[in-house]
Amino acid sequence: MEAAKNSLKAKGESQRIVVAVDESEESMFALQWCLSNLTSPDTKNTLILLYVKPPPAISISSFDAPGYVFSSEVISAMEKQSKDLVSAVMKRAEAVYAKFSSNVNLERVVGKGDAKNVICRTVEKLGADTLVMGCHGYGFFQRALLGSVSDYCAKYAKCPVVIVKHP
Amino acid sequence: MEAAKNSLKAKGESQRIVVAVDESEESMFALQWCLSNLTSPDTKNTLILLYVKPPPAISISSFDAPGYVFSSEVISAMEKQSKDLVSAVMKRAEAVYAKFSSNVNLERVVGKGDAKNVICRTVEKLGADTLVMGCHGYGFFQRALLGSVSDYCAKYAKCPVVIVKHP
């Protein structure tokens, strides 16, 4: 895959735009901003919806108790819940996309792990021209403990980053 | 003046876009990004070049010595230098703008004070739809002491913020 370049394409050249989506209203608003401002009917852009699932250790730890071993039923139920969540977020994002009659290819990428690292790595791997994301995504507790995902991406993603706040 | 709204305009509605410019290559690159990606020939947008001069206390302190009183000649020479700098940055930004044959009104605003506060206040006062800026603007020492201006604006500016890094 082409590596992300922090360089400019000429006007009218097709762009690869990654929008980081999650369960929040804000990320859907960021997607709307992107469709309103970064796409044009004259250019065939590609919009990549990126959802990052938390790593299993984090998603399980909130239920965890010392010495407790999860049964395979519990683990498969949690995996199903995680899949359902991905599907719900993607469907919601697709509904937002469908409202804009735009000349845009849609792709979907689901990552797994620490959101800020996965987003920056994916942007680079996909050769993205722009990353669009909400300001407060990926959960209050993670932000409080680890700092803001959007702060990190604004610094380290290898392309321009648009940070959108929910009104 | 209309207050900045963190809401979406319909596609084709005219936009007010603030680009924070300074002496850096990166801010000129941010301006190019803006002209390539956020303006369209079909829409009459307004691009506002915002330059923030440091407050006098900061610009003078690097020359200052305890007990030293500046003569009026020194002060007026420093004021002239500051005006020349504003003029040089604005001229450079206008040259970048002129390279893009775009349907964009150009306005210039010069602020004075702490860059991050002045940028956020100006965005709000001007009713801006988008703020575009470099990642590392407004000097190494100020960043090291006070944190990044772009970090602050990404969090507190009342509109979507685009952070552009120089390649």
Where are these regions (language model features)?
Chain A
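General small-molecule cofactor/ligand-binding pocket signal
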Residues: 48-50, 107-111, 162
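Glycine-rich, Arg-bearing micro-motifs that act as flexible, cationic patches
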Residues: 130-156
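C-terminal helix/juxtamembrane-tail motif
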Residues: 158-167
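A short acidic, glycine-rich active-site loop
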Residues: 70-88
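Small-residue (primarily alanine) positions within well-ordered alpha-helices
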Residues: 27-30, 123, 150, 157
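Structural beta-alpha unit
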Residues: 1-13, 36, 80, 87, ...
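Small/aliphatic-rich secondary-structure junction motif
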Residues: 5-75, 95-105
